[in-house]
Amino acid sequence: MGKPCHFAQFDLQPTFLVDLDELGRRYRELVRSVHPDRFADAPEREQRLALERAAQLNDAYQTLKSAPRRALYLLTLNGRELPLEATVQDPEFLLQQMQLREELEELQDSADLAGVATFKRQLKAAQAELEGEFAACWDDARRREEAERLVRRMQFLDKLAQEVRQLEERLDD
């Protein structure tokens, strides 16, 4: 038996634009129903199944609440898998990557918290813009190749955002 569709687990349609509050509400509701405390006196098989179901729900929730992971999952559902470390054949984006990394490195070297906050805001705006572009591409089956390119960009910005959070933590110490 294959893994259940992440969207179906939460009774949602497979689409990029997801109401994250509703997703969170459904997740909490479903995860309560398989909480280990509810199965403390149940046979071992039922306990194991509840634990597996909780793990499936958690995996689905983590995927759907993250825009880059949700976008990649949608591509996968449609039979279009990106290599884990897909090379970007986009010189403009490669240049942008180098510029962003250089800017982050300068912020790290200067320990500029205000600069990091500004960089983080700019990064969030860029992520929101890409998410909007992906949503538009996703709704048009003729633009799936463009959607793949945008997923790669989303993944890069998501990784960069993680690095910014780590830098903030180091500078706060």
Swiss-Prot record:
CDD domains: DnaJ
Matches recorded under SUPFAM superfamilies: Chaperone J-domain (SSF46565), HSC20 (HSCB), C-terminal oligomerisation domain (SSF47144)
Boundaries of every J domain copy: 5-77
A GO cellular-component term linked to this record: iron-sulfur cluster transfer complex
GO MF term (any one): protein-folding chaperone binding
Spans through the membrane: none
Keywords (A to Z) from UniProt: Chaperone
Highest taxon of source: Bacteria
InterPro entries (alphabetical): DnaJ_domain (IPR001623), HscB (IPR004640), HscB_C_sf (IPR036386), HscB_oligo_C (IPR009073), J_dom_sf (IPR036869)
Biological processes, Gene Ontology terms: [2Fe-2S] cluster assembly; protein complex oligomerization; protein folding
Function: Co-chaperone involved in the maturation of iron-sulfur cluster-containing proteins. Seems to help targeting proteins to be folded toward HscA.
Assembly and interaction partners: Interacts with HscA and stimulates its ATPase activity.
Family from the record: Belongs to the HscB family.
Protein name as catalogued: Co-chaperone protein HscB homolog
Origin species: Pseudomonas paraeruginosa (strain DSM 24068 / PA7)
